[in-house]
Design a protein with these regions (language model features):
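Acidic (Asp/Glu-rich) sequence patches and key acidic residues
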Residues: 1-118
């Protein structure tokens, strides 16, 4: 199983969210501990994790931590070698690249876009 990320906005007047733009970032569930420890996020699967403008800075911090001190997070790597520090750092880079694209393409939605883990 893997975590797939999407950026969504709420449909006005309806209890529904629709995906906007493209986020191709995904990673194995085995990376959960590394993600949570490096970002401080709760990382709630199959739901809205808050506004992107609040979540993205925590992912930026997590990436810096993984790049500056990868050995600190090695203990959280999965025994099956699927959830690695290196892979998680690349996952964060993919999210950040897709968010940068989103900001350029959908400037008017940046403040209302939500971060979904599916």
């Amino acid at each position: 199983m893997s975590y797939d990320i999407s950026f969504k906005v709420k449909v006005e007047g309806v209890d529904a969210y629709v995906p906007v733009g493209a986020c191709d970032a995904n990673i194995t569930w085995s990376a959960r501990k590394i993600i949570k420890k490096s970002t401080g996020l709760k990382w709630k699967n199959c739901q809205n994790n808050g506004l992107c403008v609040d979540v993205i800075p925590k992912i930026e911090v997590g990436l810096r931590k993984l790049e500056q001190n990868p050995d600190k997070f090695k203990e959280y790597e999965a025994p099956n070698e699927w959830g690695t520090v290196k892979g998680t750092a690349q996952f964060f880079r993919n999210i950040l690249n897709d968010w940068n694209d989103f900001q350029q393409w959908y400037e008017e939605l940046v403040q209302v876009a939500t971060f979904w883990i599916e």
